[in-house]
Design a protein with these regions (language model features):
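Bacterial N-terminal signal peptides
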Residues: 30-41
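Gly/Pro-rich cap/lid or specificity-loop segments adjacent to the active site
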Residues: 45-315, 369-523
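Intrinsic disorder and flexible/low-complexity segments
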Residues: 332, 355-356, 400
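Structural motif
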Residues: 299-318, 325-328, 357-365
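Long, low-complexity segments enriched in small/aliphatic residues
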Residues: 346-375, 379
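Short helix-capping/linker segments at secondary-structure and domain boundaries
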Residues: 324-338, 342, 377-382, 413
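Bacterial N-terminal signal peptides that target proteins for export
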Residues: 7-14, 18-32
Length: 523
């Protein structure tokens, strides 16, 4: 193996459906804390000399102070190769070893709309073991972070902003669109991955490893298709392929996760006794809110200021949807639903503010540029209705996105974009058994076309497998080996759903994973 020497807040009512992994970042945070002690901060960045002439040591406002920061200018309109230029923000976390592998790990953020370089301080602990022998590279994708961001923010911190009508949110979005400095047509995934290849060449890497989570898996697959000769291996964590047609299947996939919650509660005797007929009661609560939205007066979960908010079925459904991202937050849902039945919505509404900093960092304009160009042309309203039938969520969470795509500028995407990516590149495909947005079915579909791919389903896990101890070990070993063959995945057998909250004090000591049993390797 080659080696080298040392060297907005989002407008919630518009795009609440594919909200930026609010709950996933909560679970990631736990993994970050656990991983933070793996390598001491006193280690000397061995890979630094090879990037020092192109980047500069990061200031504390740019990224980790042991990293190198900088940028690369590219044309906004890559095909024309003229006109406006945009600067791509780059962070390199150099290897701490004196014997560094020449192929770095490149982190591709999710959303779409998250900024990878902006997340460097959060991401670094997750890949500490990989950073022992490899550089870790993060680039703010065009339209995000500090790379010509297409930021559209709306609302404030008040509770009433949670239930802002679509009409108000869409009007703010139109105003924002008119003021954006960039052309939203040029912020699609194809163009962004060509940017990434320019960054690869600029930094002097011949081959790279890719880690993509959620939308980042789509980006990784696109890079493999367009620049596969420069890819050593890829990790796809929570697969969102090009033909996913967001949010066409979102209600169906979320309902699957909610049904697993109901089943797991029923199979756990204590949960079944505490919350009998949970599915029936949840639907009854939504029906009540459909017929008569409630005006609730309560302290703001963060500020403590007493405010009034209208609780609609759409707001309640959106909170349930987001809570399902993480089994930890999902474990408290039965208790919060029971409280809401009796008119106490404080706990449920508090979940709406979980992971708020992640939401604020999301670029809504870039998100729309991707979804409206790549996904919305592939479905009609009747498709959304058909796929949402019989679900708790229906189409109510997605009406804002559909309306926004009616006026948002769209980039060019040809039909070939939606064909499966066929590649011999070694691939580790990870799916959370309880994932409400990128369930294992999507990973199973993608791995069929990856000749050297392996699909592992993590039981008791939601959106984001690498945040678990077992998942993190699998990612680290796979990147080190460069092949999924022979990878020991027995640790998945010990992963279980967290116990349900039976009292405000928390769950019973023993976790439950009864309906989630049987996960593991899936081809």
């Amino acid at each position: 193996m080659a080696r080298r020497a040392r060297g907005t807040r989002v407008l919630r009512s518009v795009l609440v459906a594919f909200d930026p992994r609010r709950q996933r970042l909560r679970s990631l945070h736990a993994a970050f804390v656990l991983a933070a002690g793996v390598v001491g901060a006193s280690c000397v960045p061995a890979g630094a000399p090879l990037v020092a002439d192109k980047l500069h040591p990061c200031a504390s406002t740019e990224g980790p102070t042991d990293g190198y920061c900088g940028g690369l200018e590219v044309y906004e309109d890559r095909a024309a190769a003229s006109g406006r230029r945009i600067r791509l923000a780059i962070v390199v976390l150099p290897s701490v070893s004196s014997d560094v592998h020449a192929d770095p790990l490149v982190f591709l953020a999710g959303g779409p709309g998250q900024a990878a370089a902006q997340m460097a301080s959060q991401v670094q602990p997750l890949f500490r073991k990989i950073q022992r022998t490899r550089d870790v590279v993060l680039v703010d994708q065009r339209g995000t972070g500090k790379s010509s961001p297409l930021n559209c923010r709306g609302g404030g911190d008040s509770l009433r902003d949670l239930s802002e009508p679509d009409t108000d949110a869409l009007e703010k979005l139109r105003t924002c669109l008119a003021r954006l400095p960039g052309d939203p047509r040029f912020y699609t995934t194809n163009l962004a991955m060509d940017d990434l290849d320019d960054v690869r060449a600029f930094l002097g890497y011949d081959r790279i490893n890719l880690y993509g989570g959620s939308y980042g898996t789509r980006a990784a697959l696109v890079y493999v298709r367009r620049h596969g000769e420069h890819v050593r291996a890829i990790v796809l964590d929570g697969v969102a392929p090009m033909d996913m047609r967001l949010p066409m299947y979102a209600a169906r996939d979320a309902q699957r996760a909610l049904d697993r919650l109901y089943d797991d509660c029923w199979h756990d005797g204590a949960c079944r006794a505490a919350y009998p007929r949970l599915a029936e009661r949840t639907r009854a609560l939504m029906a009540r809110l459909d017929a008569n939205p409630l005006r609730v007066t309560m302290p703001h979960p963060r500020t403590g200021v007493t405010e009034e908010i209208e609780v609609t079925s759409k707001l309640a459904a959106s909170i349930v949807f987001r809570a399902l991202y993480s089994p930890l937050t999902a474990s408290i849902l039965p208790s919060l639903i029971e409280r809401a039945e009796h008119g106490d919505f404080q706990g449920l509404l508090a979940l709406a503010f979980a992971g708020e900093s992640a939401t604020d960092a999301m670029s809504l304009g870039m998100q729309l540029s991707v979804l409206c160009s790549e996904d919305s042309p592939r479905y009609a309203n009747e498709d959304l209705v058909r796929e949402s039938l019989g679900t708790l969520f229906g189409t109510r969470l997605f009406t804002g996105q559909v309306a926004a795509c009616g006026f948002w500028p769209k980039g060019r995407v040809d039909d070939a974009y939606y064909t499966p990516v066929v590649s011999p590149v070694p691939a580790l495909v990870l799916s959370g058994e309880l994932d409400p947005v990128t369930p294992p079915t999507w990973g199973l579909e993608v791995v069929k076309h990856l000749r050297n791919g392996r699909h592992i389903v993590m039981p008791g896990t939601g959106h984001g497998v690498a945040a678990t101890a077992c998942g993190n070990r699998l990612v680290t070993e796979f990147v080190d080996r460069g092949t999924a063959g022979g990878l020991d995945a027995r640790c998945v057998r010990a992963v279980q759903r967290p116990g349900f909250f039976l009292t405000p004090a928390g769950p019973e000591p023993a976790p439950v994973a009864l309906a989630s049993a049987g996960a593991g390797d899936r081809r």
